[in-house]
């Protein structure tokens, strides 16, 4: 009986032809930088707590999505941006990103309460805030819509040769939307200067990420488009800043888009109307005790010689800013009824 031919050894896999970014290093912040991170994160936390109170009192209508627990992401990433040329766009959980980009808390709170002094003149509410002056392009209520718009912002940066980068935030739920992948494809084809930021807070409304995503390592989502991804501890502001530095170096050097998956956690429900019965109080408390981003910065500051008593004046200052923003929002007038007929048609191009 003839012998079967010997099986040939499988050839070694071809070397990857895809360049990869360096592994980001945790940012080495000075005492002054750490204090600024602490102030910004505390401002977001206290602002959102006040917004939740105003919602409960009926001053805020419609939907309201709070950023409590995720503060390190917006502060760490946006502290690395150039506010003169870089643009930011996000979804409906947008208050924290606006505060991290230096927008006045008073006009944000006024928008939340539907006042004419709000950043969108009281028409946008919680989910639809916008400021071309500050290069903040929303605030979008349609899940995933901001990702393709972010690719458009990046195209504008490249077309105008202004050196700017677009940072487009979206969540783990939006990561399953079809238009996200269309945006990935075009961004890589045209080597657009965009950082896709997936804020993986573990739950898309009430559905955990591993129940909704066959690939729950979301930083890998761009591999078939040749877009590199990095997974980041989104509860550590210094890790976030370090990842931003690496991503910006990649994008500004003309290598095209990059994905940052920020592993974070929201303490409140999806929105103010969500009782969050899909997870236990013990789960939330465990994350607070082990991974709270603000407490982590306080520990860093302690190693630099700052004690709890040194931080109390900052807490008092932040509470004063937030209370003044709430008072302003409650006292300023609502939009004139004639505003119903403005911003309906495009009047200038």
Where are these regions (language model features)?
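Short gly/pro/ser/thr-enriched loop/turn and capping motifs at secondary-structure boundaries
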Residues: 96, 202-205, 266-268
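Short beta-alpha connecting loops at secondary-structure transitions
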Residues: 202-207, 227-232, 277-286, 311
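A glycine-rich, aromatic-flanked flexible loop/lid motif
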Residues: 190-192, 210-226, 263-275, 290-293
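Conserved thiamine diphosphate
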Residues: 158-162, 214-246, 290-315
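Glycine/aspartate-rich loop-and-adjacent alpha/beta segment that forms the canonical ThDP
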Residues: 2-4, 13-15, 19-22, 250-349
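N-terminal amphipathic, basic-rich helices that act as targeting or association modules
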Residues: 2-93, 101-103, 349
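A short, conserved beta-to-alpha structural element at the edge of catalytic cores
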Residues: 190-210
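Cofactor-binding active-site loop characterized by glycine-rich and histidine/acidic residues
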Residues: 49, 57-190, 208-214, 219, ...
């Amino acid at each position: 009986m003839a012998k079967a031919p010997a099986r040939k050894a499988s050839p070694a896999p071809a070397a990857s032809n895809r360049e990869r970014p360096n592994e980001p290093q945790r940012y080495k912040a000075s005492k002054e930088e750490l204090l600024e991170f602490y102030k910004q994160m505390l401002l977001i936390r206290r602002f959102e707590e006040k917004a939740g109170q105003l919602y409960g009192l009926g001053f805020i209508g419609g939907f309201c999505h709070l950023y409590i627990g995720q503060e390190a992401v917006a502060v760490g990433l946006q502290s690395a941006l150039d506010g003169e040329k870089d643009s930011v766009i996000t979804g409906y959980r947008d208050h924290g990103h606006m505060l991290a980009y230096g927008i006045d808390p008073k006009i944000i709170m006024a928008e939340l309460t539907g006042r004419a002094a709000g950043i969108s003149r009281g028409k946008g509410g919680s989910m639809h805030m916008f400021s071309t002056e500050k290069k903040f392009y929303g605030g979008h209520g349609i899940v995933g819509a901001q990702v393709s718009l972010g690719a458009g912002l990046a195209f504008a940066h490249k077309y105008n040769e202004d050196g700017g980068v677009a940072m487009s935030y979206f969540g783990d739920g939006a990561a399953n939307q079809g238009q996200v992948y269309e945006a990935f494809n075009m961004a890589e084809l045209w080597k657009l200067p965009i950082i896709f930021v997936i804020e993986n807070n573990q739950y898309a409304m009430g559905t955990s990420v591993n129940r909704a995503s066959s690939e729950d390592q979301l930083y890998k989502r761009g591999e078939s488009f040749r877009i590199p991804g990095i997974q980041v501890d989104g509860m550590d502001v210094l890790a976030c800043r370090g990842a931003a530095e690496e991503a910006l170096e990649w994008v500004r050097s003309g290598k095209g888009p990059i994905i940052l998956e920020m592993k974070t956690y929201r303490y409140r429900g999806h929105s103010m109307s969500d009782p969050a019965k899909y997870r236990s109080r013990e789960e939330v408390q465990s994350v607070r005790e082990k991974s709270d981003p603000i407490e982590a910065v306080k520990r860093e500051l302690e190693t630099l010689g700052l004690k709890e008593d040194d931080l109390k004046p900052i807490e008092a200052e932040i509470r004063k800013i937030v209370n003044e923003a709430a008072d302003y929002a409650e006292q300023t007038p609502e939009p004139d009824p004639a505003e119903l007929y403005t911003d309906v048609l495009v009047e200038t191009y």
